[in-house]
A protein has these predicted regions:
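Conserved class I S-adenosyl-L-methionine
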Residues: 2-61, 74, 78, 160-189
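A short acidic, Gly/Pro-enriched loop at the edge of an enzyme's catalytic core
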Residues: 121-130
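Short alpha-helix
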Residues: 192-215
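A short SAM/SAH-binding and catalytic strip from SAM-dependent methyltransferases
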Residues: 129-145
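A short glycine-rich, Lys/Arg-flanked "PGG" loop and its adjoining helix->strand segment in the class I
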Residues: 145-160
């Protein structure tokens, strides 16, 4: 079992080290994109997600925030720009290297740690005010219960766990824009794709000792939810107009994203 976990961890690490320098990820580090984020840190978050956290956490200034599976690190930059003490953790050394170059250029004091999100083995108990996982994290997690146990462990008493990811309600469908819904699998077929259900996320959090405070179901705000990076490059404004209106695009009738915030007992 342990050998299998180590093999998967190496596989995931190799994948993201390669993806970090792909055209898609380089597009997230363009001067135009970063300049917009630096001027408006809120731009790093999907509409409604930052507001959900701020409603419960309050002012981020001075807060110790951990971002496991930090990916493009836009959220890490944003929290640091808002005055938080940020620690970015990712399984990919290359992701952290690329992010570190940006934060150094911007003179942001962000700590970068290469670690597995499930175990968070390099972090002590009761360290952080907020742990935030964002889009794309959960589909790579093989043991959701362990991940939330360790998130609860590294949180201070009264600290917060926040997540934002693709809504599990989309999982049974092919999610092809403009087409009638086409079911490809049962909602309960979690494996082998590791597509967690809403109950899996909620139960793993609650059983870890985190009290669910609020959940938000968020609809798609742009065309990027419906198309890959390469597909988007070929689309015109006319082709993506009304894409988030369910009367034109039937699959837009269900929420695209889910966000949740929970709290460790004080």
């Amino acid at each position: 079992m342990m050998q299998h976990m180590e093999e998967r961890e190496l596989e995931v690490k190799r994948y993201w080290n390669e993806v970090s320098d792909s055209e898609w990820y380089r597009s997230l580090r363009t001067e135009e994109r970063l300049d917009r984020l630096q001027k408006d840190p809120k731009a790093a978050f999907y509409p409604g997600v930052l507001e959900l956290m701020a409603k419960h956490v309050g002012d981020f200034r001075g807060k110790k925030i951990l971002l496991p599976s930090s990916g493009d690190n836009h959220a890490a930059f944003a929290f640091a720009l808002m005055g938080a003490q940020v620690t970015s953790a990712d399984i990919s050394e290359r992701q952290l290297e690329n992010a570190g170059q940006i934060s150094e250029r911007w003179n942001l004091d962000i700590e970068y740690i290469c670690d597995d999100t499930t175990r968070l083995s390099k972090f002590g108990d009761g360290t952080f005010d907020l742990v935030y996982t964002s889009n794309g994290t959960l589909s790579w997690i093989t043991d959701l219960a362990e991940m939330y146990r360790n998130i609860e462990r590294v949180l201070k008493k009264g600290g917060y766990s926040a997540m934002y990811d693709v809504h599990p309600f989309t999982r049974p469908f092919t999610m092809e824009a403009w087409k009638a819904p086409e079911i490809r699998k049962s909602y309960d077929d979690v494996f082998p794709d590791l597509y967690w259900r809403v109950q899996d996320i909620v139960n793993a959090s609650a059983r870890a000792g985190l009290r669910i405070l609020e959940m938000a179901e968020i609809r798609s705000a742009d065309a990027s939810f419906w198309y890959t990076f390469d597909e988007l490059k070929t689309k015109t404004a006319e082709e993506t107009a009304n894409i988030n209106d369910w009367k034109h695009n039937p699959m837009a009738a269900i929420p695209a994203w889910i966000a949740m915030i929970a709290q460790k007992q004080a």
